[in-house]
Amino acid sequence: YCLSDANLKYLICGAAVYKGCNRMAKRVILAVAGAGKTYHICHEIDPQKRNLILAFTHENIHNIQKELYDAYKCMPELTTVATFDSFVYHELILPYEPSIGEHFGQPGFVSCGICMIDPPPQRIKTKTGKSIANPLYEPKDQLAHYITDRKQYYCATLSELALQVKKKRESLIKRVAARLNMFYDCVLIDEFQDFREHDYDLIIALAKQLNDVVLVGDYYQHSVSATNNSGRPFKKKSVDVSYDEFIGELERAGFEVDITTLDKSRRCSTEVCEYVSNKLGIEIMSFGTNPGSVIWVDENASRVLEDPSIIKLVYKGASRYTFRAMNWSYSKGDTVDAACVILTDDFEKLADDSFSTNRISVVTLNRLY
C-alpha cells in the first residue's frame, strides 16, 4: 500500500482512538553468556501480534528462525525477521528516496542498488606514513558521501544517511517511526551490543519514537566481533565505558533496564561461572542444569590437542593450526560438550591467586569471557 504522510498520520490517529493511548514501552534486557537471549526473544513474543525481530548477522537470523520454528512449529505469520542492514535499506532508505534526493538538492534522484565496499576514508597515509586529506572523500552534507559513482548506496553509511535526512524540519526518523508504529506492534533487537556508532545512534533515535521496543544483549560480549568493535556506546573518546555507566546511559535515553530476567547461564556450569566471576571480575551465575569443570591441562596436553571431540579455542588464526580450532571471538554463542581454551601470555598466571586483570584490555577480557 502507498500512503502519503498525511494519510499515515490520519491512520495512526485513528488507531490511537481505537486502541486507546498506551504508554510507550522501551526495555533493555542485559543477559549473561548462555542465558538464552535468542530463546527468550522467540518464546516471549506474542505470535498473534505483528513483531519485527532484527539482528546483526545472518548467523543470528538463522538462529532466530530456527528458534521460532522450535517454539511454534512454523514461522509465525505476523512476525518479520531481518538483519539490521536489510531493515535500514528497505524501511528507512528506499521508501524515502525522493526525500533523500530533495534533502541534498538533487530532486528526482534514483539509486541503483547497494554495495558492500567501504566508502573513501577522510584521511589516508602516504608511502612515508604521513596522514593527508583523501581527495576522494566527500563531506557528510553531500549525497556523494553515501553513494558510489554508480549511484549505489554504501551499506556502511546507511544509518548515517538515515540520521542526516530531514523534510523541512521533520526528521526522517520521526516519519519512519510513525510508519513502523502503524505496521508493527513490537520491535525486538537481538545481540544489540554488536551495534556501534551510527547504527547505535539510529537504534536509540528510533526507540525514542517507537511504541514498543525491546533490546537484548550482553554488555560483556561487546567488542568481541571481528568487525564493528569500537566506538559508541562502549567508548567515550579513548576511555572504556563501564557496566554501570552503560546502564546509566540507557536509562537517560528512556529505557527500563532489566538485569535479572537473563542473569543466569543455562549453558555454563556452576563451577565455570564461579571461575569466570572470580578470575575475570564478570558477574555470572548458573542455572545449574549442566555439569562442567575447569581443568588445567599440564601433563596430557598432546592427548587433548589430538582429540577431535574437544574443540580448541585460540585467540586468533584458527585456520593455521593442524588441530580443530576456532577463534575465541567466533565461538560466541556456541554450545559444545568440551572445549580447550589455549591462553595467551596475558593469562599465563590465570591459575595464581595473585592474578589480576588490571593490565589486560577490555577487548581481550571480553573475548576470553
Question: Where on the chain are the PLM-derived regions?
Answer:
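The feature marks helicase ATPase cores and/or their adjacent C-terminal helical subdomains
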Residues: Y1-Y369
